[in-house]
Design a protein with these regions (language model features):
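Bacterial N-terminal signal peptides
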Residues: 8-16
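An acidic-aromatic pocket/loop used at catalytic or ligand-binding sites
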Residues: 2, 20-121
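Bacterial N-terminal signal peptides that target proteins for export
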Residues: 1-8
Length: 121
């Protein structure tokens, strides 16, 4: 009976971990994925080494507006250490420990945004 209980516990622990992992942009464990956005994974870019990195992800939604997405990231990213630097047109800029994060509106209908994380040399 104890073995069965342990197996059930491990199953639920794995399930919870999988659900939590789904709440972040794939490949960017420090960038949350807003409800209503889905990731276009075939367009992701990821490369780097011990000193620098470049990550790029595309997200899309047919029902969200960019203003709601911008508000979500302005509120949530500072909780993960990102410091909001302001807007540059339709771009949101954040900075954290030698890295920049940029959120760019690529299109309106459907909404497509690009999130880029770059290390500063």
């Amino acid at each position: 009976m104890k073995k069965l209980s342990a197996l059930i516990f491990l199953f639920f622990l794995t399930l919870i971990s999988t659900v939590n992992a789904a709440n972040f942009v794939e490949g960017m464990e420090d960038v949350p994925l807003m409800d209503g956005l889905s990731q276009i994974t075939q367009d992701d870019i990821s490369f780097g080494n011990e000193e620098t990195r470049l990550l790029e992800a595309y997200l899309t939604s047919r029902r969200l507006k960019f203003a709601a997405v911008a508000n979500f990231y302005r509120e949530s990213l500072p909780q993960l250490g990102w410091i909001y630097q302001g807007n540059r047109g339709n771009n949101l800029l954040f900075y954290r420990e030698g890295e920049t994060l940029e959120i760019i509106k690529e299109s309106v209908k459907p909404l497509i945004i690009r999130i880029t994380v770059k290390s500063k040399p």
